[in-house]
Amino acid sequence: MLERYGIVTRETVLAEGVPGGFSSLYGELSNLEMLGTARRGYFVEGLGGAQFALGGAVERLRELRPRDGEEAEPLVLSAADPAQPYGASLPWPKRAGARAARVAGAHVVLLGGEAALFVERGGRSLVPLREPEEAWMRQALAALVTHVRSAGVKRLAVERFDSEPVADTEIMPLLIEAGFVPGPRRAVLRP
């Protein structure tokens, strides 16, 4: 589990459905700490108090942490990726009407380490996980476009934003600005 997640917490173990829960692994994780294979500490704010991590994971987190005055780079991850903590170690952000899940084919755009935009499987719907604001939406869409183009996706056709037809929403001009081509019922991005 340490190899898969890098950091293991009570919530991670519960999400994995390990028989006996966290207490069944705690002794082994403590042994790995004594052997120098794992570290125990409080590495990620908001996760449980007892956190065990591989040394490389801790160093990677430190590298990714923005310095004073710097803004964190946006990150697009598969919603089901073990490195994506929402829906496993962390609850999805609560926002009226927002629905997100750890399903194959869906993606999450993280801004500053926080889930901002959920891309449903197939890309037909974009679900904001925080109140929509132009500044962060522009940043999230730019990251999504970069991800789609670098991943070799044939096309991304967005039909809905926040449960509304995309053509009727305030995000359409931002999609066009990001490189999408408007259509009668959707905005399409081709690599």
What do the predicted segments below correspond to?
Residues 1-191:
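Long, charged, low-complexity, helical-prone intrinsically disordered regions
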